[in-house]
Design a protein with these regions (language model features):
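Membrane-embedded beta-barrel scaffold of Gram-negative outer-membrane proteins
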Residues: 1-11, 49, 53-56, 133, ...
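Face-selective signature of the C-terminal outer-membrane beta-barrel domain
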Residues: 1-110, 120, 197-200, 236-243, ...
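Transmembrane beta-strands of outer-membrane beta-barrel pores
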Residues: 2-4, 36, 47-53, 97-105, ...
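Extracellular loop and loop/strand-boundary signature of outer-membrane beta-barrel proteins
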Residues: 11-20, 27, 60-69, 107-117, ...
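Hydrophobic, lipid-facing positions within transmembrane beta-strands of outer-membrane proteins
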Residues: 24-30, 74-80, 124-128, 140, ...
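Structural signature of Gram-negative outer-membrane beta-barrels, strongest in the C-terminal barrel
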Residues: 38-42, 46, 66-203, 291, ...
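Conserved C-terminal beta-signal and adjacent last beta-strands/turns
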Residues: 80-83, 131, 142, 175-180, ...
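Gram-negative outer-membrane beta-barrel transporters
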Residues: 88-93, 200-205, 221-316
Length: 396
């Protein structure tokens, strides 16, 4: 796939592109299953590539240094996942392992005059999960797994000058790692239309990447690099439940009332030995709604989404919202002192419906943000208000 973004200086006939960014992603996956009785083993490998093309201009046709160099990331992965049924199929056991090799390559970038550099690293990530079926649809489950977040190419191998600061990559930089443990209880009776699950989870994050800056006392040159320093921890619960009212009548349709809730108990990160609440994390997130599906093909869904408060850094308040600080001094004085802002909670509803016209042809309607809620997912970027989409589909 290709994503291309051109940012213009203004919305006029004389405007020009001052920042152009193109990101190309491609790859493949090859996998197979080995079935031995009721035991199943999946294995395979995959490849993912990202190629960035970025160019910045200070005048029409005059190149300037972009905020980061062009790069190419290549990742190869090998995985093995087994799903075993033991003790007369009362115990479902899943054990897996994944190995990833990632290669970074920074490319020469107009305006930065940086040299081409490359770095690489590899990582192993195991996982194990178990589910024990007790009786009558009741089961307990638990799992443990590790994961990683790939570093940016310039954090690992960069060396370029931008806005007077020399950025130097750290070849010893490790990817951010996480370990997650969860356990819970589930009850499922499809013939009764009932499904319920409760899960408690705890996640540890290690080797979070932070910036490290200093100034050379003799030359006055500013430097910036990256290191693994911080930690984080998150814990909470997830509840999912649904009931199909269609089971009370006949099997011609399903009318499912559903809901799921994530409630965070802990969300903290450690910087220089001090634990603070992690920014941009909501304490509550919930989805709920009503789903209708008829055997003749008509379907409809009303979905609601609730998002709790979130706290972010107040990057744009002084420049674009000069009157906001006066309001914050009255309502959020503690956050104003720390240059933070607490965003309000919101609830958004969406509606969709689809109906078959003739064989293999259907039409549908989406109404997003049904009640025209004004909300943001990121400060300064308000999400679209009420909008409509009409679609038609033909299957072969």
């Amino acid at each position: 796939s290709t994503a291309k973004t051109d940012t213009y200086t203004a919305d006029t006939d004389t405007a020009y592109v001052y920042s152009g960014n193109e990101l190309n992603t491609y790859g493949f996956t090859a996998h197979d299953n080995l079935i031995l009785g009721k035991q199943r083993i999946a294995f395979g490998f995959d490849n993912n590539n990202e190629v960035s093309e970025i160019t910045s201009f200070k005048a029409r046709g005059e190149i300037k240094a972009p905020y980061q160099p062009r790069f190419r990331n290549t990742a190869w992965g090998i995985f093995l996942q087994s799903n075993l049924k033991l003790f007369k199929e009362k115990l479902d056991l899943s054990v897996g392992l994944r190995y990833d090799y990632i290669d970074f390559k920074l490319r020469k970038t107009p305006g930065l005059e940086n040299e081409e550099k490359s770095e690489s690293y590899n990582t192993f990530n195991p996982n194990i999960g178990a589910k024990y079926n007790i009786y009558g649809g009741m089961a307990v489950h638990a799992s443990f797994g590790t994961a990683f977040s790939m570093t940016d190419a310039y954090q690992k191998a960069g060396e370029f000058l931008y806005s007077g600061t020399l950025t130097v990559g750290n070849p010893d930089l490790d990817p951010e790692k996480s370990r997650t443990l969860d356990a819970g209880l589930t009850f499922s009776r499809p013939e009764l239309g009932v499904n319920f699950d409760f899960t408690y989870f705890y996640t540890w994050n290690d080797d979070l990447i932070v910036e490290e800056a200093w100034t050379d006392e003799e030359s006055g040159q500013k430097y910036k690099t990256f290191k693994n320093a911080d930690k984080a921890k998150k814990s909470g619960m997830e509840i999912m439940a649904s009931y199909d009212f269609g089971r009370l009548f006949d099997s011609d349709f399903a009318l499912k009332l559903y809901g799921n809730l994530t409630w965070m108990f802990t969300y903290q990160d450690q910087t220089k030995g001090v634990w603070n609440k992690t920014l941009s994390v909501r304490k509550q997130n919930a989805n709920f709604g009503l789903d209708f599906l008829h055997q003749k093909g008509f379907s409809a869904r009303l979905n609601g989404r609730f998002a709790g408060h979130r706290i972010e850094k107040n990057f744009i308040g002084d420049k674009y919202r000069p009157t906001l600080n006066d309001l914050l001094s009255e309502s959020q004085p503690g956050y104003l002192t720390d240059k933070l802002i607490k965003h309000p909670q919101f609830m958004v509803f969406d509606f969709s419906a689809s109906c078959p016209l003739i064989k293999n042809v259907s039409v549908g309607l989406n109404i997003n943000n049904l009640f025209d809620e004004n909300y943001t997912e990121k400060d300064g970027y308000n999400m679209p208000g009420r909008n409509f989409q009409v679609r038609a589909a033909m299957t072969f």
